[in-house]
Design a protein with these regions (language model features):
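A broad detector of the eukaryotic-type serine/threonine protein kinase catalytic domain
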Residues: 30, 35, 73, 98-102
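General N-terminal targeting signals
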Residues: 16-21, 45-47, 71, 78, ...
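Catalytic or ion-translocation cores adjacent to nucleophile or general acid/base/metal-coordination motifs
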Residues: 62-80
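Short linear motifs at secondary-structure transitions and domain/linker junctions
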Residues: 3-7, 21, 81-85, 171, ...
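Cytosolic-facing loops and C-terminal tails of multi-pass membrane proteins
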Residues: 85-109, 114, 118, 122, ...
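Peri-catalytic and regulatory segments of divalent metal-dependent proteins
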Residues: 1-63, 67
């Protein structure tokens, strides 16, 4: 299935059966802001990357480990929240074993991220895969440092919640150029998060064969959201997400 949410993100989700050791149901989760940020070919690269996690051609064992990590994390979250049957015994076992499994499987999981990037490059081109990665990193930083702090400050300064937050975000994504002359040095010097399977941006660009002299041009007038969903549906989603 395909799900839309209000996040600047995309993910391949796995709903496990039998503790994630055999049958799984697959979901592709796409954030509306992501669709509004990217051009259609860049979005195709992102989707191909996520489908690459389902692909078994680049090392079936690494792919299975990647999916098993995702399944176990969701299982642990369900147990911790009391939303799944299983009892205290299962919860104690998973809480004890998960750190060991996480440490030993991280290298394989990161290798699978590179394999998924290869799928993205094969489908949409290495240039589209690279520019999508850079746009997402730049806008994620802008959201954390600029947009969301401004929204929170507005909420504290007025007696009512900010209205149409996601419409404001859509307008900002349409007007912000997010096209630096050169990649910021801080972006290239980011260190890997020990809890994240994704390699650093610099390593992912290098694996794609894209140099650090990459220049990301301003997005064209048509976003992937407008091209694929249509303006009317985008406005309905913005209103729904703003009310939630």
């Amino acid at each position: 299935g395909i799900l839309l949410n209000p996040e600047l993100n995309a993910a391949a989700a796995y709903v496990p059966h039998g503790f994630g050791l055999w049958r799984q149901r697959h979901y592709l989760i796409l954030g509306l802001p992501l669709l509004q940020l990217l051009e259609t070919r860049e979005l195709a690269a992102v989707i191909a990357h996520e489908f690459g996690h389902f692909h078994g051609g680049h090392g079936r064992f690494a792919g299975w480990i990647y999916r098993l990590r995702s399944s176990w994390y969701r299982l642990m979250q369900g147990m911790a929240g009391g939303g799944m049957a299983g009892g205290q015994l299962f919860w104690l076992f998973f809480r004890w074993y998960a750190p060991y499994f996480d440490a030993y499987s991280l290298v394989l999981a990161r290798r699978h991220e590179y394999a998924a990037d290869e799928v993205a490059a094969a489908v949409a081109g290495a240039d589209a895969a690279a520019t999508a990665l850079v746009r997402i990193e730049l806008v994620s930083d802008w959201l954390q440092r600029g947009f969301w702090p401004d929204i929170h400050n507005s909420a504290h300064a007025q007696a009512y919640p900010p209205a149409q937050v996601h419409a404001q975000l859509s307008a900002a994504l349409a007007t912000q150029p997010f096209a630096p002359v050169a990649l910021p040095q801080w972006l290239l010097e980011q260190e890997a998060d020990p809890d994240d399977t994704h390699p650093t941006l610099a390593k992912r660009l290098a694996a794609l064969g894209v140099g650090t002299d990459l220049q990301v041009q301003a997005r064209g007038p048509a976003s992937a959201a407008g091209s694929l969903l249509g303006d009317a549906l985008v406005q309905q989603l913005e209103q729904r997400f703003s009310h939630e």
